[in-house]
């Protein structure tokens, strides 16, 4: 039986709350909070997050027919999982992901660390998080901003460092699971067409460029995202 698992990233609240619309649309789906996101200590690499997720799923009896969907860090974890354990993964639906280190300005990382120490910088960071989520409906946006307050900028810094170390260019050709890529074309944080690179590297993959969506398509345009995932699931069943 197919088990859908949604994996969050450091943005859109930095926790599983960003998948509230999908958890409603797919009643038996799962969306764990990764370590260090509200509780515990963050992991130091995508590989460690992947092993944590696998243990979390196996403890609940989910070890095959997994449909893994994630954005940013969560997308990296999903892709790593599918490469490491291909017999357990049925399909992937990924957003805002690169198969190689992203080009990020050093000051963008320092900004998160400074926000953890300086109240004025912290407020600027919160304002930035609020601005990035401008496509999200107001009530949910406020809820996710509160989650950002709880998770904090230092945890986000750690996640960005982990993302920027992720590199599977030498393994991407071994991917067996059907792959759906969804890219928000109005992403204010985009520094390259990374999804297109993966699409070209994985024969048979599907790339959707979603209008009026930015960094978090699943929460910015939930109806469009859910429809795209529904169609993808119907194609692989």
What are these regions (language model features)?
Residues 1-41:
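Conserved HGGG/HGGXW glycine-rich cap/lid loop of the alpha/beta-hydrolase fold
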Residues 41, 210-226:
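Catalytic histidine-centered segment of alpha/beta-hydrolase-like enzymes
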Residues 48-65:
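Conserved acidic catalytic loop of the alpha/beta-hydrolase fold
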Residues 70-74, 78:
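Gly/Ala-rich beta-loop-alpha elbow adjacent to hydrolase catalytic centers
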Residues 79, 83-84, 89-120:
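Flexible "cap/lid" loop of the alpha/beta hydrolase fold
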Residues 103-105, 120-173:
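Conserved alpha/beta-hydrolase catalytic His-Asp/Glu region
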Residues 175, 181-183, 187:
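Short beta-strand/loop motif that positions the catalytic acidic residue
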Residues 188-194:
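Conserved alpha/beta-hydrolase "acid-adjacent" motif
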């Amino acid at each position: 039986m197919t088990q859908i698992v949604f994996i969050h990233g450091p943005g859109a609240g930095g926790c599983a709350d960003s998948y509230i619309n999908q958890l409603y649309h797919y009643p038996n789906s799962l969306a764990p909070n990764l370590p260090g996101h509200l509780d515990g200590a963050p992991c130091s690499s995508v590989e460690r997050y992947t092993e944590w997720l696998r243990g979390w799923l196996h403890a609940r009896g989910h070890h095959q027919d997994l449909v893994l969907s994630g954005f940013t860090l969560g997308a990296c974890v999903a892709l790593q999982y599918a490469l490491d354990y291909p017999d357990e993964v049925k399909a992937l639906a990924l957003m805002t992901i690169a198969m190689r280190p992203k080009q990020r300005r050093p000051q963008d990382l320092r900004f998160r660390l400074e926000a953890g120490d300086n109240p004025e910088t912290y407020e600027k960071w919160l304002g930035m998080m609020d601005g990035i989520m401008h496509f999200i409906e107001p009530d949910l946006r406020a809820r996710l901003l509160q989650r950002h307050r709880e998770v904090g900028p230092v945890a986000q810094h750690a996640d960005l460092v982990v993302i920027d170390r992720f590199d599977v260019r030498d393994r991407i050709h071994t991917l067996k699971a059907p792959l759906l890529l969804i890219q928000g074309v109005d992403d204010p944080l985009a520094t390259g067409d990374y999804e297109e690179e993966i699409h070209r590297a994985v024969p048979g993959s599907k790339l959707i460029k979603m209008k009026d969506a930015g960094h978090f398509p699943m929460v910015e345009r939930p109806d469009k995202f859910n429809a795209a995932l529904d169609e993808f699931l119907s194609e692989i069943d």
